[in-house]
């Protein structure tokens, strides 16, 4: 089974996480500079890691509205959809970066020194939330093979 790629978009860096082959667990993958080569690197990852599905976190405002950061993220999603050979879906990522900072602090990590890793952990949280939701929906529908949805 192919993997799912999760992305935490930022103006400076893009955190990437990848699922295991069973699509149950998300793992930090890498941090990519948010520059002109970012889409090419993501296309490379999709090819190398046999990704057939990409989940992009959209930073909605706390009231659920789409702000400037979410608008930029949605524009990037459209660029990805134009170049990637697989579906690109969006996922609400409110407070994942805050949660990633907290998790790293609680693990005794200096988040300033591991700035790029915070983005990977945020991407991992986005992807894990997506994987958990898919599994929950499939289980509630009585599907043993939740990936068929």
Residue locations for each model-derived region?
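Phosphate- and other anionic-substrate recognition elements at nucleic-acid/protein interfaces
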Residues: 2-7, 11-12, 17-149
